[in-house]
Amino acid sequence: MQTEPVAPMLEMRCISKRFPGVMANDSVDFTVLPGTVHSLLGENGAGKSTLMKILYGLCRQDSGSIHFEGKEVDISSPSKAISHGIGMIHQHFMLVPTLTVAENVALGLGGRYGISDMRPIKKRLSEVSERYGLKVNHDALIWQLAVGERQRAEILKALYRDVKLLILDEPTAVLTRNEVDDLFVTLRQLTADGKGLILISHKLHEVIALSDEITVLRDGKVSGHTRPKETTRDQLAQLMVGRPVSFTREVASEIGRASCRERV
């Protein structure tokens, strides 16, 4: 018996974006299904960050369209993205250090409760924390938290807003091994609940371990699309750099260095 095909949660169709002297995205197609992790790979300057900035409303595409849950959407700002159910966890966390976790969540809620009454916010935060295993003290000031706890606070802030699609930019870059394991448990729970995840990472072993789909960008274009069971780290590295490689310590180091440079 054949199963019905799953309708995409997100379709970015023929997205192009030019900056002075560089074509950051050149007719890029990118699709995310509900309940899946779709990883986006590429070297420094490949166009990953630009594509995700377009999706999150941080810049506008020159051409192409974005379709979310079957409808074409115009995403002109991060608040627009959030209103559609699209959230983003940045590599450098976007939290106010002198406010508590709960107060950071309350920022930008449009005065539904206001910071003067945190009880409804804390109640729901506790529910979301328990559901996804995101343990963090909601009354702690952000500056008092460890890096892994700050990331959990960022994820809680997005989930509080009922996001359906979450972009994670290099989420394991500053985490310990145990924190990475905990994060992966949370991400799998999110996909089990039907949420779509976009993972930007240069750690190929993590991409293969966590992803359902993998898209590779090179020089602003899609150089390949595959699934973990159909590929290897060597093949992914070749799609990234455009030449045959053997995944040695040298190649891993080169890819790691690229992720730390300024990205387009």
PLM feature segments, named:
Residues Q2-R263:
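Glycine-rich phosphate-binding loops of nucleotide-dependent enzymes
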